[in-house]
């Protein structure tokens, strides 16, 4: 058993031969109770990891085997591990060795906070510490800290959350896992028809009914904003490009702010009367502009999608 195995009892790694699981990543999220494991798990899930909460260590290997042998498109698994039970230390040591044999890259994230901060957090939610067992709150915290001491020393990433907000913790996680803070926001743009209801899940709603309606042009009526004749008609209309110029600038400013505030998904809706022509064309046009800025953008057409499903 190498040094890391001895420390988790101790979390070890060693080079192994290639296997179907080679290249798969496992992140173990652990640390002091009240230090922010749940918040960390949510942020890590936003980074594209498949997150499992309260995972017994001995179930990790079967789960990785299932994911890598079933052709799953999941390649990164984050598991919130509760290792307060001393038996779990032995389980975790054996599991890490087995994952190493499979060629899985494993890392341990340990979240910590000062005793004073942990006490304030527990008092604010009026819940007992899991190891308190009728004793003082500080006794439970000290017992857990002693139990996790070796694990913390051999963790790959240690974050003290004592003075961090949720947003700051998320930024720290990005830096620790990806090497940089969150700088991009994923954008989803969709079109809709006002006569079918205003969407309630959009961050921005643009009303483009001020543009001429292709519906009243006989040769365009049966087409949609995805068709070039309709798109050309809409975008060449007076005010269309000017509107897109202004809207693009406003959205770009907002996206920069969202990234700083740890908001990584933005939904923009374009509405016209029926959701077939103008809103579709304008959605596609804005998507093209934002992609040129290097943003990840997806586009959908609510009313057209409904029609296709019927």
From Swiss-Prot:
PANTHER family: RNASE ADAPTER PROTEIN RAPZ. Pfam families: PapZ_C, RapZ-like_N. GO terms for molecular function: ATP binding; GTP binding. ATP binds at residues 31-38. InterPro entries: P-loop_NTPase, RapZ-like, RapZ-like_N, RapZ_C. Coiled coil: none annotated. GTP binds at residues 82-85. Belongs to the RapZ-like family. It comes from the Bacteria. Keywords: ATP-binding, GTP-binding, Nucleotide-binding. Displays ATPase and GTPase activities. This is Nucleotide-binding protein BAD_0837.
